[in-house]
């Protein structure tokens, strides 16, 4: 019998183990992608694992833990999204000098418009939006908690629709 990560996630009972598996599922590596038509290249995130499941299955498996993991899961996703946006913006090492939060919104918009839904960034955005929505509807998360959770990355909050 073949187990995939989303199927394995549905079999786990421990929230701590589930959070660790989700962290592994959504781990990525940065690849250098050459530019086209004279543009310079950039770093691009790629999932470390090739899924035999489709994107909806991966998203459903992660979102299914929203009730039990709550803010811990949303925090993991938002921090990962911020790291990827900073990587792509090229300001990872200059966070102290440049307000990278202004670039996060553009990175998210570019991915949503130009990338297929299978993109690493898009899967995490879909998961974060759905989990944030569930937490708000269940009154488990207030706006001030979202801003505390994400820090100064206001554009990330707005772009995810968590305001």
Go through the PLM ranges and name each one.
Residues 1-163:
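Extended alpha-helical scaffold segments
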């Amino acid at each position: 019998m073949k187990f995939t990560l989303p199927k394995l996630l549905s079999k786990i009972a421990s929230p701590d183990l589930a959070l660790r598996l989700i962290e592994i599922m959504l781990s990525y590596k940065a690849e250098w992608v050459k530019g086209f038509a004279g543009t310079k290249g950039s770093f691009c995130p790629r999932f470390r694992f090739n899924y035999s499941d489709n994107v909806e299955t991966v998203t459903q498996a992660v979102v299914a833990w929203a009730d039990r993991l709550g803010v811990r899961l949303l925090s993991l996703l938002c921090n990962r999204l911020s790291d990827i946006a900073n990587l792509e913006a090229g300001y990872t090492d200059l966070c102290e000098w440049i307000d990278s939060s202004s670039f996060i919104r553009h990175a998210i918009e570019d991915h949503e418009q130009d990338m297929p839904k299978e993109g690493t960034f898009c899967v995490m955005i879909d998961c974060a939006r759905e989990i944030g929505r569930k937490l708000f509807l269940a009154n488990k998360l207030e706006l001030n908690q979202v801003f505390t959770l994400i820090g100064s990355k206001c554009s990330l909050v707005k772009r995810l629709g968590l305001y």
